[in-house]
């Protein structure tokens, strides 16, 4: 089973690489616009940020520029995953059109920017839970993984200008506190909880 859907032909008839769609969704029930809320509980989205650089600090314009790599993880119990690899299971762009992605924005950037827009992201499935054999009705043998036991992992890259209110009354001995603010779209705030994990500064110290 481990050799099924591994992008290599291990069977002489090549049947091990047929029907290898990684995501199974009941299209008549799955509604992409709605978060994966279950039994009245909110969807937890775990957030980490790598700050790759901070540049172009402009006190007069009250802005700074930052290059970011952002990590988001959540689970969607409405999805079944198939034949997951332990080494990475990246989703094609076409699949991203059919699954729910967190509607998150930078609220203090120049213009509210959607963090999870397709042009900025990659999405991977992390194999964490145990496998289950396909149902007997399935024509192709393989393993299934439950959406509530395996994380969806989204990585986003952005370089943007952010607003910051600089306090200059003690210049040049001042210390400024600026932020990068991430918000959930208003209509979904009652269904989603952002869970901060860590933030790393990977740029050059000056």
PLM features: residue spans?
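Non-transmembrane, solvent-exposed beta-strand/loop segments in proteins
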Residues: 21-206
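Short, disulfide-bonded extracellular cysteine-rich repeat modules
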Residues: 7-23
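Activation on extended, non-transmembrane soluble regions of large proteins
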Residues: 1-7, 13, 45-48
């Amino acid at each position: 089973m481990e050799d099924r859907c591994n992008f290599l032909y291990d069977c002489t008839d090549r049947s091990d690489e047929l029907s290898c769609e990684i995501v199974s969704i009941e299209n008549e029930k799955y509604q992409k616009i709605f978060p994966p809320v279950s039994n009245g509980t909110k969807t937890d989205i775990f957030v980490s940020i790598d700050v790759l650089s901070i540049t172009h600090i402009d006190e007069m314009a009250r802005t700074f520029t930052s290059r970011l790599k952002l990590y988001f993880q959540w689970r969607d119990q409405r999805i079944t995953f198939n034949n997951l690899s332990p080494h990475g299971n990246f989703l094609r762009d076409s699949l991203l059109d059919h699954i729910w992605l967190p509607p998150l924005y930078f609220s203090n950037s120049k213009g509210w920017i959607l963090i999870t827009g397709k042009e900025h992201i990659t999405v991977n499935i992390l194999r964490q839970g145990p496998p289950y054999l396909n149902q007997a009705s399935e024509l192709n043998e393989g393993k299934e993984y439950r959406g509530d036991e395996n994380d969806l992992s989204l990585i986003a890259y952005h370089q943007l200008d952010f607003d910051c209110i600089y306090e200059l009354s003690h210049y040049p001995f001042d210390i400024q506190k600026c932020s990068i603010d991430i918000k959930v779209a208003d209509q979904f705030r009652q269904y989603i909880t952002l869970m901060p994990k860590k933030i790393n500064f990977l740029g050059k110290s000056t």
